[in-house]
Amino acid sequence: MEKPKLVYVIYIRTTLQKLWAAITKPQFTREYWGGLANVSDWKKGSPWQHVTEGKKPEIYITGQVLECIPPKHLVLTWADPDDSAEQSRVTFEIEAIEDMTCLTVTHGNFKAGSTMVRKVSWGWPRVLSSLKSFLETGKGLKVWAGR
C-alpha cells in the first residue's frame, strides 16, 4: 500500500523573500501559525522546532533541515517530539510568478497507520490560509479557534 502524500498549492501576492521570511523567521511565523514559532538556523543538518515562546517553551513539532536553498526550497523532517519514530517529511517549493508567488507544500513519508496524517491534513489548510492573509493584509487568521 502506498504511503499517503498531501500536496497543497497556494498563490500569494508577495515576493519570494517575504514568503521565505514568513516561513523561516519566528517573528513572522507566530503571526499566522497560532502563536507558534519556527526556530532554526536553517542550515542543512540543523535541528528545527515549532515551538511556543516564553519562559517555558513548549515544543509541538521537531525535526531536521534536510535541504535549504533560500528563498525557493526547504525540506524538513517533521515529528511529534513525544514520538520521533513517527517522522514524516515536508517540502516547501516557492516559485515567483509575475507579481505573486506559488507555494507548494508537500507532506509525505508518513509511517503506515500514522496519526500525524489526520493532524496535518486538518492543520495545513488553516496554516496556509492564515499565511496568505498575513502576507497580503498584515494579519493572520484566527483559524485555531475551536481547536
Which residues make up each language-model segment?
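Hydrophobic/aromatic beta-strand elements that line small-molecule binding cavities or substrate pockets
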Residues: I10, I61-L66, S88-E95
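Short, highly charged C-terminal tails/helix-capping segments
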Residues: S133-R147
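Hydrophobic pocket/interface hotspot
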Residues: L19-W20, T29, W48, V65, ...
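Beta-strand/loop substructures that line and gate deep hydrophobic ligand-binding cavities in soluble
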Residues: A79-P125, L131
